[in-house]
């Protein structure tokens, strides 16, 4: 690496040193430019104004200059939130550039308002925008003000920009192949991806959605789903898109948190976004918004307590106080309703509008009846497997038994129910539910079993020993398929566990584990096939016949396993069962004395066991553990979401009767069929247009109702957004706390206030100051002060040292020097007295400010106290009663000889302070006025042009440092 810095070899004692130098040096600022930027930093309005005026005349200062951090004067003013200096700079036509973006990122609302209202004068010569942005811009070209404001999620700034009618580019679809997307991706794929990410980051801002969307809940649903799908395509930015998707989900959930009544909740959850569907009055109170939330997998929204409370109320309709009842009462009630489900179903078939017919339509009763029907079906399957009705086992085509005839209506009822569900919800929605796929497989197996039994009954009439049947006999295949369908039917009962709070999370964890098993099987099958191919290739030549083996048995199922790797299928079986320890090692032996072949085969077999058992199996366990832990961490949300999907399946109209009663046509079904047949094949003529007028009237009424419902929805959304914004701002202020930025703002306010006080004092000179790193000027001042201070240590804190009876009073380092006030003696007395009366309240307010910051209450007195908590021992100093007179020059000289010398007063011990103060006479009631007056009359004694309160910023720094450490000591200066 050293070769990058020097090339020739140097054998000097310092040859192991690497010379360093600045290779990318920047243009240095002049002394005037440094002073200009420093004045902007400190908030010195007068100095900045003077520098700008001189720049317009003499062109000695580049008002668009930048400090080493790339900040111009305008950016510094924005960072310090100094709006007065910002307005002053804009009035002098400084270069704006990215100032608006900078103000938005700093979240300075006042600066944003000022920049939005700023209009550049026409014809002015600005610095070229391209050069400035290319060199110093902190933002990419695709970032717009509204996008950056949305990234910061500042509601006030977003509102200001939206009122200006700003726009955001519309992102294309995820897999868009238009010319613009293809060309942009080919030219610069990184910029294309970053630009799309920035757009989606802006669109996902909760404040922007709340302000600009008519239906913010639906917008959050769709945007969250789109971002989730986009994370699967943009794998490089998967984490960012998933975070934005989660942000949209939480926004919809937080918005629903603001609902305060059941009416608001019902209006939100029953609202439809498609007006064509809203025109059907029978489909209004069907929780349309909640169905959309389930469709887009908005688990946080669905599991929200307000939503769950409304769902529970609808679910237990007709059973008030159900949750407060004892579990024994609940069990007996459910068992009673379950045993009565046949009578309730018959009552509904006969009279759907009767009390019993309406009772079975309730969601909870419907769930109990369907569960009881399915348990009855499982009980009959158990009877069929136990062969309660004995038949001849050797009949090739046996007729159906009584139990099988009883099972058939249930199977037909299940098939009819699945057909109706697919017809109502659509094929796409049907296949997205895994339980529907399981039902489809189960019903297919039952249909195949019934078909094969019919074929066997028709084709085979005789009796024959079962041992002599061929392998693919229809009866044998039907029995195998019926056994598999019994397993699936029993496992289907797990779906009902979702209704229970204890078994529901376990059922969800089981589903996640099945996904992990499928992922594991993909890798395992690859390993299995690889080793099966190798072992079969090695042992193919050593295959033996069955007659050569004991008991004429060939394969791994024999008492003595043999030919384990003779064929590919046999090898796959052998390797699979070896995972469970069911394969012996001697299967790798061969009858020939080929020890090398046996060694290679045993090594391959051992390697397979190590990979499958030690590596893959432990990986599967880790994956399943991770899935379970993921569910356990979000058990409440996952379970409530799954339970809601179960409940919603019973809230819908239709599917009231459980199998097998659902296959029986009801009078209502005959009525619907007759109306459809009459309207389709026998249309009636309507010469008077009576039906047309009736349809138009009903359409108008439904449309008016939909408009009213939409208006109610917009009112509720408006209230929810207001509450959400108020809560968001309140939480942000609560969580913000005290940060370093707060102390910087406090320091900036004190610095600005200091210059304002100096302007109020008047007669302040504006010296040109240099921000050079050399400390020559400071050392010169210190040497000057040291000359008058004797052997005292140097200190940056300089204050007045007033002699009183030839004894000095030491004060806190609050005031450095007083500027020279030329011509002060010539002013009239009224003017000086008015100035003194004006300055008094200002310093009183300053004392109150410092006392409040220390947590103390300060009462305004004739002698104001100024307290600074800087962790130093308390010291007190009182001004002497300085008698001021402007009558004649002699009296002024006599007053000047009262041993009032300006020097440096350091912070010392508090010892002797009381003694010194007791020797001094009491100060006048307006000590500050006396001090200002004597300073004006003795201006010739002041040989320093420094500001009055130059050390306030340093005292504030020390104050903040000590205040953070919890040291609340006080230094009090009495003026």
From Swiss-Prot:
Tissue: Expressed almost exclusively in brain, in mitral cells of the olfactory bulb, in lateral cerebellar nuclei and in pyramidal neurons of the hippocampus. Very low levels detected in liver kidney, testis, and uterus.
Membrane-inserted regions that do not cross the membrane: 326-360
ANK repeats: 30-60, 69-97, 98-124, 141-170
Membrane topology: Multi-pass membrane protein
SUPFAM superfamilies: Ankyrin repeat (SSF48403)
Region Disordered: start-end pairs: 766-795, 816-838
Record-listed Zn(2+) binding positions: 172, 176, 178, 181
Chief place of localization: membrane
Cysteine disulfide links: 553-558
GO MF: actin binding; actinin binding; ATPase binding; calcium channel activity; clathrin binding; inositol 1,4,5 trisphosphate binding
Residues where Ca(2+) binds: 418, 421, 436, 439
Null allele phenotype: Conditional deletion in oxytocin (OXT) neurons in the paraventricular nucleus of the hypothalamus increases anxiety, impairs sociability, and causes severe hyperphagic obesity, postpartum depressive behavior and reduced maternal care.
Stated regulation of activity: Activated by G-protein coupled receptors via direct interaction with GTP-bound GNAI3, which increases the channel sensitivity to phosphatidylinositol bisphosphate. May be activated by intracellular calcium store depletion. Calcium channel activity is enhanced by MYLK, that promotes its subcellular localization at the plasma membrane.
Family, as annotated: Belongs to the transient receptor (TC 1.A.4) family. STrpC subfamily. TRPC5 sub-subfamily.
Assembly and oligomerization: Homotetramer. Heterotetramer with TRPC1 and/or TRPC4. Each subunit in the homomeric ion channel (via ANK repeats) interacts with one copy of GTP-bound GNAI3; the interaction is direct and activates the ion channel. Interacts with TRPC4AP. Interacts with SLC9A3R1/NHERF. Interacts with MX1 and RNF24. Interacts (via C-terminus) with CABP1. Interacts with SESTD1 (via the spectrin 1 repeat). Interacts with PLSCR1. Interacts with PKD2L2.
Record-given protein name: Short transient receptor potential channel 5
């Amino acid at each position: 690496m050293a070769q990058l810095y020097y090339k020739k070899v140097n054998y000097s004692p310092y040859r192991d040193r690497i010379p360093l130098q600045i290779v990318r040096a920047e243009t240095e600022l002049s002394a005037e430019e440094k002073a200009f930027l420093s004045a902007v930093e400190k908030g010195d309005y007068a100095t900045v104004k003077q520098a700008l005026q001189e720049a317009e005349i003499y062109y000695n200062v580049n008002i668009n200059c930048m400090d080493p951090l790339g900040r111009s004067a305008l950016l510094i003013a924005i960072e310090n939130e100094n709006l007065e200096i910002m307005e002053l700079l804009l009035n002098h036509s400084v270069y704006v550039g990215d100032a608006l973006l900078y103000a938005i990122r700093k979240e300075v609302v006042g600066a944003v308002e000022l920049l939005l209202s700023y209009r550049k004068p026409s014809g002015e010569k600005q610095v070229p925008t391209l050069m400035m942005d290319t060199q110093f811009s902190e933002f990419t070209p695709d970032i717009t003000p509204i996008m950056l404001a949305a990234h910061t999620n500042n509601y006030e700034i977003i509102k200001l920009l939206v009122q200006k009618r700003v726009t955001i580019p519309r992102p294309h679809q995820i897999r868009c192949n238009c010319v613009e997307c293809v060309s942009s991706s080919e030219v610069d794929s990184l910029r294309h991806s970053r630009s799309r990410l920035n757009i989606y980051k802006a669109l996902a801002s909760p404040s922007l959605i709340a302000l600009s969307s008519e239906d913010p809940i639906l917008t959050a649903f769709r945007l969250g789903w789109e971002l989730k799908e986009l994370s699967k395509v943009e794998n490089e930015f998967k984490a960012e898109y998933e975070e934005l998707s989660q942000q949209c989900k939480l926004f919809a959930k937080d918005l629903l948190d603001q609902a305060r009544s059941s009416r608001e909740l019902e209006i939100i959850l029953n609202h439809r976004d498609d007006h064509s569907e809203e025109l059907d009055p029978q489909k209004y109170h069907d929780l349309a918004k909640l169905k959309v939330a389930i469709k887009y997998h908005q688990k946080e929204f669905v599991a929200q307590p307000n939503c769950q409370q409304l769902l529970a109320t609808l679910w237990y309709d007709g059973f008030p106080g159900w949750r407060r009842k004892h579990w024994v009462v609940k069990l007996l009630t459910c068992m009673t309703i379950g045993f009565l489900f046949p009578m309730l179903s018959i009552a509904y078939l006969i009279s759907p509008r009767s009390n019993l017919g309406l009772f079975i339509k309730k969601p909870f009763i419907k769930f109990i009846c369907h569960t009881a029907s399915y348990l009855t079906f499982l009980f009959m399957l158990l009877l069929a497997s136990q062969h309660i009705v004995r038949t001849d086992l050797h009949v090739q085509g046996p007729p159906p038994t009584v139990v099988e005839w009883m099972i058939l209506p249930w199977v037909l009822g299940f098939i009819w129910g699945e057909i109706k569900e697919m017809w109502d919800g659509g094929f796409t929605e049907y296949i997205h539910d895994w339980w529907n796929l399981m039902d489809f497989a189960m019903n297919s197996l039952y249909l195949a079993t019934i078909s094969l039994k019919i074929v066997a009954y028709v084709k085979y009439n005789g009796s024959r020993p079962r041992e002599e049947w061929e392998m693919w006999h229809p009866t044998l295949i039907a029995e195998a398929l019926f056994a598999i369908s019994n397993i699936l039917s029993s496992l289907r009962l797990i779906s009902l566990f979702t209704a229970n709070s204890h078994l529901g999370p376990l059922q969800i964890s089981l589903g996640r584990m099945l996904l992990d098993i499928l992922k594991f099987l993909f890798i395992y099958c690859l390993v299995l096939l690889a080793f099966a191919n190798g072992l079969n290739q090695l042992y193919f030549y050593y295959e033996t016949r069955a007659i050569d083996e004991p008991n004429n048995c060939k394969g791994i199922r024999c008492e003595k396993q043999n030919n384990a790797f003779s064929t590919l299928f046999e090898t796959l079986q052998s390797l699979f069962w070896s995972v469970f320890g069911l394969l012996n090692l001697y299967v790798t032996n061969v009858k020939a004395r080929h020890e090398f072949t046996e060694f290679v085969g045993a090594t391959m077999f051992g390697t397979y066991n190590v990979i499958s058992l030690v590596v893959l199996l432990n990986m599967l366990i880790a994956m399943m553990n991770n899935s379970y832990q993921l569910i356990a961490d979000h058990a409440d949300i996952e379970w409530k979401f799954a339970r809601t999907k179960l409940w919603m399946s019973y809230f819908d109209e239709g599917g009231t009767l459980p199998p097998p009663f659902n296959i029986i046509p009801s009078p209502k079904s005959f009525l619907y069929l007759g109306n459809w047949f009459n309207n389709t094949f026998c249309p009636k003529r309507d010469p008077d247009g009576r039906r047309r007028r009736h349809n138009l009237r009903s359409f108008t009424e439904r449309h008016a109702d939909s408009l009213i419902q939409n208006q109610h929805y917009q009112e509720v959304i408006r209230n929810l957004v207001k509450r959400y914004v108020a809560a968001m701002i309140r939480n942000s202020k609560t969580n913000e706390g005290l940060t370093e930025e707060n102390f910087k703002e406090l320091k900036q306010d004190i610095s600005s206030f200091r210059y304002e006080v100096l302007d109020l004092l008047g007669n302040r000179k504006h010296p040109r100051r240099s921000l050079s790193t050399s400390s020559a000027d400071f050392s010169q001042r210190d040497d000057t002060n040291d000359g008058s201070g004797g052997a005292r240590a140097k200190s940056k804190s300089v204050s007045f040292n007033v002699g009183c009876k030839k004894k000095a009073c030491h004060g806190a380092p609050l005031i450095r020097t007083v500027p020279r006030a030329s011509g002060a003696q010539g002013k009239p007395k009224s003017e000086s007295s008015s100035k003194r009366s004006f300055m008094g309240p200002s310093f009183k307010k300053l004392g109150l400010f410092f006392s409040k910051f220390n947590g103390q209450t300060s009462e305004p007195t004739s002698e104001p106290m100024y307290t600074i908590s800087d962790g130093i021992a308390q010291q007190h100093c009182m001004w002497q009663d300085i008698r001021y007179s402007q009558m004649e020059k002699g009296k002024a000289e006599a007053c000047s000889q009262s041993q009032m010398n300006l020097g440096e007063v350091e912070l010392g011990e508090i010892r002797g302070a009381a003694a010194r103060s007791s020797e001094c006479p009491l100060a006048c009631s307006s000590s500050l006025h006396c001090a200002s007056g004597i300073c004006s009359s003795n201006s010739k004694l002041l040989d320093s042009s420094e500001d009055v309160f130059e050390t306030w910023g340093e005292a504030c720094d020390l104050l903040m440092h000590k205040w953070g450490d919890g040291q609340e000591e006080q230094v009090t200066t009495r003026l």
